Amino acid sequence: MESGDHLGNLFDDMVEEDNDEDSFEEPACEDSFDSQEASSKANEPQNDSFDEPIQSSVSKQSDDANGEDEINEEVIQEQKELDLNEEDFNLLTIEEVPLDVLTARIRRVFTEVTYRAEPAAIALFDVAHKIIFKSTMLDCKRNTVIDSIIEGLISIIVDERERDQGAEEAEHVLMIFIAKLAIKNKSMKCSDLLYKLILLVDRLYLHADSFVRCRIYRLIACLMEEANRYADVMREHGDDAFLSDEDPTESEVMIPSGVKNRWMGKLAKSLLDKSPEVRCKAVIALSLWDHDIECKTTCCDEVTVNDLLWKSVHDVDESVRVNAARRVHIANENDIDKCIDYVETSKDNRVKQAIIVRLASDVSLLSFSEKQRFRLVNLLNNSDSARVQDVIHQLLVESWMKVAGDEIISPSIFPFPDSDNNNIPKEFPSIILEYLDPLVDPTAVYVFMKFATVRFIQKSTVQQACGSLDVEKFMKDLLSMTIPDCERVGLMRRTTFRLIPKDNNDGNEDIRKIFSRIFISRCFVDVIFNFAKGRLDATHLRSRALTFFLPDVTTFVEHLEKFCDAYFHRNMSTDYTCKDLVLYNLLHLMNVATKYGDLHDDKMLYKHALKKILGNSSFVFSSETILTIVMICFDLCKIGDDVKQLCDWMCDTAKQLMLSHEEVLNLEEAMKNDKVLEQMYLRSATMLLATCKHEEVESPTASMSSLFKTIIPALLGNKNEELQQLGLELIGFATSIDFENCEPYLKLTTLLIQRGDEVLTSTGVNTLIKVIKSQGFPKTANAIFQGEEQTEDDCQDALAKVFEKALVSLQGMALVQSVQDCLSMLSYGRYAWSKLMCAIIMLVFQKSNECLPLVKIFASYCKKSIRSDFNKMNLLLGFCRAVGIISKTGEDDSNIKLLEMTELVCECISSVHTIDGDEVIPQKKRKTDNEEELYPEIVLANRMVGRANSHPSSWIIRHVFTAMATSLRLECVPMKIVDTLHELLVDTYTVVRFNSNKTTQIAFKRFLTHCEKVITLHERMNALKLGVDFKKVKKEVICADEDPKSVSSSSSLGRKRGRKRENSEEEEKIDADDSFELFQYVPKSTRTRIRPTVNVEEDQNIKTEIEDSDDLEDSFEL
């Protein structure tokens, strides 16, 4: 191995990502290591921006003449070119010069590196290395070459001048240059420069200036990175020597282990530095250690480097979090799970984006487990951030498709292609099915396949430069593929479309191939149809896609009937796993073909085929499939008469299905004798349920009413819980359209809710909510409890208790469904139901740690549904009731996130201004009986202040007032009402101050200060009410006896600041203290503070003067 092989290309892979994230400008470095040369160049104009990769010591002079500009450019170009034939840069003459000449030459080298940056560093590295190596060979007490380097580096580090980004980049180039020289010389048993650098770091890493600490940590990062690179190269050299039967030499450790451990401990402590810039540099340097090395923290706990980096991911500063996310070690599946967990739960979009970039760029597709792949792909659908979805789309899809294209040509489920004779395009979209099984999560794979298809079209078309997709060329390329190649990638065309395999050897394997081909065809068709939206040639593109990928509707219907007969027959011996998925995708493609087809009788033909499939009792379908088929049949109806005829047909078919295997012709008699099969019950009831669900069915027909009376009691009385659940759902939809005939079944619903089964309870709650939405709460309550209760109010109270008890008894996804149904009911009508809102709030924030989407559902409800003051007051009363219940438990025993709950409620009930054109219109407020405006923010604040006054030592006061100080907006509340609230807070603070702990006092005082800021804002707004042009006010003549400061502005605030207020006797005795620091033992009361008021007489004089002026504008009127 050559002596410089371990260095590689000097600066190719040195990219400092943290330069863009730093929020401060570091001081500029010294421009030269040679003081004499620096003094000689002091009179010349210099450019210190370091923006260009190669800098010149003479700045460009801008002249008007074109000839002078060309001359200047030629001079600058000559100065940029580095002459390596100079004597100072001649490697052959270094052996024959004394130490003082070597010192002058090394200064010249660093001067050129300073000005010319990376190109000079690459060209002069060997020269600098030989100079340093030669200086260490000389017999002298003081090595002036190394001392010059150290002195120049110190001048860079401790310099406090402000720097721009170019200067920081030049500083980084110098540090890398010095670190590479130190490691290179250490590898040749010459460690003087490295030890000097170690001493410099140990002397300055505890410096008081944060800028100095930042540069020291950057120097540590450069040294560690070069040492790691040398270790990697030597490790590879050792592997090569082992394979070639040579004796591998022992690799020498560049930086002693004791020094590395000492630096690691200091960097770990620096993660808690007060400066975010220092913490950023500490994270970057610490990430260069191995992920599993343990170090001791300030609490003497041993944690790994990766754990410290993950702690920095949760730092308070965003730049620190982003830098830590970019540099966490991803070494195994646990680290990948940790990254995905953070992306799924965090709200910091920049950090999530940085982690996804790491996962896409640094982790191969083959390193992810199947579960991890699906979790990442599901973020394309489930993520709330469009930026995160875009990063996954552009980076993750690109990375995974490249890896898949390098590994395979076609999925293994299809016939393996002949590698020597195939015309399959590289990175065809269907190859991702090898790593993402659509049977596991069809929706996630469908989304990924669509993005992969768009990427493939962009890469294969010629018009990608102009931003459009050439779909015609894409289909022509597919048409050029041979039939065997199409078979190998799962591509079906109109001529090769089939659903029944030719050789039915393995049933499940064949149905998987069919599903994959149909799935791929659906993705291609949907991508082309989405692309055609809004285009002038949309009809042409859709017709081309249908002609290319799908058969005509008549042939398609024949394929559908044959497929159902082959795989859904009752007497089938094999249970096929994915036949329902195949049928669902087939129905989707059939819907597309009939909607955008050319023939007018396609819909009638399609509906007739579906009715034939539904009426065939020998076919066995799942409930979801039956619902889908029935909905499609109603969607294909054109007029209302067709809907009624189809309803009668559905009812008649359901009766025939229940009597299909019995000799009895009377349905009621067959039900009474238990002659109807449960399977036929399920199918008939599902058909009837789907009929009631459709929006076109608004009223029942005679056959529907008759069937309701027959089938609902039979379903509720059946022992099968699935049939009971279906009966409850049917009651809800049937009662919505036929309340008179189905009213008695509501009592049975309440009885089934009280049985204790979670599924039946959740279904019963859903049924009652559907009836309440259609018929109203009083009518529903009377229908259930009219005979048991005396008055209508008692009936409504009884129904309310049923809901509240049922909601509290549920768990898991049944609870999620019921909460969502209850919130939809509350948003649908006006219900003063604070108890139900209290139960929902407590359940949402009590179950927030159980991976249930309750908080997301509740936040969406607050954002979209709570707009009127009535709904705000209902939410407020429910919250206050919940706070009262939570306060009865201890802080350690309570598992409710009170702070998050209060923040969400405060943000929801806070009033905001709405903008209509150029006017700002505040929201209208509901008035009480005393004709006073009601503000929910003030109601909430008064209730919480009253609780603080009655229970000042309660632990909830700290959380509630901390959230109110940051989330409760009072800007829209009139100043008079806020002033009253402020006086109440001042009176209550005395009670809180003497009866609560320090943190509670701080939280209460924060809200008090928040009110004071709002009052100050109102005062300023009142002062700006006068529509006066500021420029004209400045031109007014100032009286000689008037203070200039008091009339410099049109507002009364300037006069108020200029006039000093005399303190009262009580205020002179007490020192004012507005601090919120934790070391303050007892905060002083704000009771004695007197808010400065505006001088009314002076304001009146100014108003009179302004009214007398006719030429004043109203440009500042709010």
UniProtKB/Swiss-Prot annotation:
Residues 13-34, 1107-1118 have a biased composition (Acidic residues). Transmembrane segments: none annotated. Residues 35-60 have a biased composition (Polar residues). InterPro entries: ARM-type_fold. SUPFAM superfamilies: ARM repeat. Residues 1-69, 1044-1071, 1090-1118 are annotated as: Disordered. This is Uncharacterized protein C30G12.6. It comes from Caenorhabditis elegans. The lineage of its organism: Eukaryota, Metazoa, Ecdysozoa, Nematoda, Chromadorea.
